[in-house]
Amino acid sequence: MKLFELQPAPGSKKLPNRKGRGIGSGNGKTGGRGHKGQNARAGGGVRPGFEGGQMPLYMRLPKRGFNNYEFSKKYTEVNVSDLNIFDEGTVVTEELLKSSGLAKKIIDGVAILGNGELTKKLTVQATKFTKTATEKIEAAGGKVEVV
């Protein structure tokens, strides 16, 4: 057997369905779109949920419950491992995190998360700390200050 004689296993490759190639193909003339109407046109069709002008089902059913998401506080998250860029003994404030690029946009404050390891003794000031973040900062000899 030579390289040019290699062929895929029979039945493993399916030919694309070619529309509009004669009536005998089964997909000729209208190409599976039926006769006339919005769906037969190029770019035709209606959006999902549209019922031809009839009040759609999702609007006929009552609303239920509420969502409190927009009232929740949005904290900028910074991991403990990211704080290793600062020098030993630095007081890490939210302004310092922003100027260093670790916290790009501070809305309701900064939350320090406990992912990774901290190797330097730092005093960290932030709005929120996770339990593991507090443990890791204090284990490195640093201090945690909730602002």
From Swiss-Prot:
> Mind listing the UniProt keywords for this protein, alphabetically?
Ribonucleoprotein, Ribosomal protein, RNA-binding, rRNA-binding
What this protein is reported to do is described as: Binds to the 23S rRNA.
Q: Which GO terms describe its molecular function?
A: rRNA binding; structural constituent of ribosome
- Biological process according to GO: translation
Supply the Gene3D superfamilies for this chain. Answer: 3.100.10.10
Looking at the UniProt record for this protein, which Gene Ontology cellular component terms does it annotate, in alphabetical order?
A: cytosolic large ribosomal subunit
* Protein's recorded name: Large ribosomal subunit protein uL15
Assembly and binders? Part of the 50S ribosomal subunit.
The record's section on InterPro entries has: Ribosomal_uL15, Ribosomal_uL15/eL18, Ribosomal_uL15/eL18_sf, Ribosomal_uL15_bac-type
Is NAD given among the entry's keywords? Answer: no
Q: Where is this region: Disordered?
A: 1-54
Q: Which family does it belong to?
A: Belongs to the universal ribosomal protein uL15 family.
List where Gly residues composition bias occurs. 22-31, 42-52
